[in-house]
Amino acid sequence: MPRPSLCADSGGGMMTTLTARPEAITFDPQQSAQIVVDMQNAYATPGGYLDLAGFDVSTTRPVIANIQTAVTAARAAGMLIIWFQNGWDEQYVEAGGPGSPNFHKSNALKTMRKQPQLQGKLLAKGSWDYQLVDELVPQPGDIVLPKPRYSGFFNTPLDSILRSRGIRHLVFTGIATNVCVESTLRDGFFLEHFGVVLEDATHQAGPEFAQKAALFNIETFFGWVSDVETFCDALSPTSFARIA
């Protein structure tokens, strides 16, 4: 027997129901946002930070294509599109010094310490590494936000942007599922936002089990998991219903 769908706001508007795990979730696209996390050369392109640090980025191309599809559908349905770029200033002041755990745990910073010739090239604002991949181009009306840590809510105006627009539902895509995507969704959960991940529009940093573990955590404890085709179907005109 199917579980009932969830609806956070019954105050009216054009609503749609997205089939997801562990249950369907109902939302108003015009009061929702698609969050595109860190689709930069650093994370999705050979020669970028993840590749140079020893992570496999060979299967990111389908993810890029799926994000293109999801963004197009979301924009047509009136959803706000928010793009994140992870990184720091050219001097890495924003990355933190030895007194910051980020200094010790960031694989980008560790890679540059091991390979000094890369200093200033990884995740530095203005660098090729920091730029979004060529296939994904923000459009007028989209919002592009820099972030200095894994979570898109930390030291950014994201929560204020969402609350000022009455946005409670967030649909996540991007890289890496087990790091910045999950971190941002978790923080959103603590701030009373409903988070959905489109699993085929995300990619892990590390082995495949890291992707599976992150999705398990999300659907079991923090949010919902769906896919791009189901998301696009939910945003088709025939899927909308007015809820009084």
Curated annotation (Swiss-Prot):
Keywords: Hydrolase
Induction, per UniProt: Up-regulated by the nitrogen regulatory protein C (NtrC also called GlnG) and repressed by RutR.
Catalytic reaction(s) noted: (Z)-3-ureidoacrylate + H2O + H(+) = (Z)-3-aminoacrylate + NH4(+) + CO2; (Z)-3-ureidoacrylate + H2O = (Z)-3-aminoacrylate + carbamate + H(+); (Z)-2-methylureidoacrylate + H2O + H(+) = (Z)-2-methylaminoacrylate + NH4(+) + CO2
A biological process term (GO) from this entry: uracil catabolic process
Keyword Ribonucleoprotein belongs to the record: no
Function: Hydrolyzes ureidoacrylate to form aminoacrylate and carbamate. The carbamate hydrolyzes spontaneously, thereby releasing one of the nitrogen atoms of the pyrimidine ring as ammonia and one of its carbon atoms as CO2.
Protein name: Ureidoacrylate amidohydrolase RutB
Species per Swiss-Prot/TrEMBL record: Shigella flexneri
